[in-house]
Amino acid sequence: MPSIPNLSQDFYRFIWDGRLLISGINPYVFTPEQLANGLLKTTELTSLEAISNAKILIQGMGSLNASHYSNYPPINQLCFALAALFAKTSVLGSVIVLRIIIIGADLGILYFGKKLLERLNLPAKNIFWYFLNPFIIIELTGNLHFEGVMLFFVIWSLYLLDKKRWVLAAILLGVSVSVKLLPLLFLPLFYKYLAPDGLFKKGFWKMKKFYWVTLATIVFTFAP
């Protein structure tokens, strides 16, 4: 738990974005290099000294990352902000908060994944192929990649969809997109769950509503 990732430097950008957010700065508007060069001058942020460990974070993320705008969706940014709120001055503290979030998501995957497998009459023990996978432990939990958080919302959405609670399932799918954009590719695959007995017309309209709820959720999360 209390260890700095050594196979990825992305976490420096996560912490940077979070500390920008709690300073009232939109992480999508300025690159770290622009702020380092003094592009932004406000009463709230007149120098990099206003952001704790700013020089360490910029150096740690590397010049390639520091020269680009943030591309992390808003729910991801919310996680970064939480890390900044609970560990305003400590890089290791922020890492621990982010890791707790990811571990919590993995436990959620274990819970809803097991329930979903049981509903599908598949061996519930198969969920441990994910939960105990060394790659998952190293890359997600160890190196703080948020695909696990995204997958938690996807699995939860699939579980609710199997229970015919498609509105809440659509909302959760929208939230998953606001963690990582990858679930957008899955949208066409939801048709089989929304078209009972292959009834195209009924399935089409339900799928259309499902997509609209998902899109509305995405827009809502991006609005702030």
Q: Where are the regions a protein language model picked out?
A:
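Intramembrane catalytic core of multi-pass membrane enzymes that act on lipidic substrates
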Residues: 1-99
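Transmembrane-helix motifs of polytopic, lipid-linked glycan transferases
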Residues: 82, 93-120, 128, 151, ...
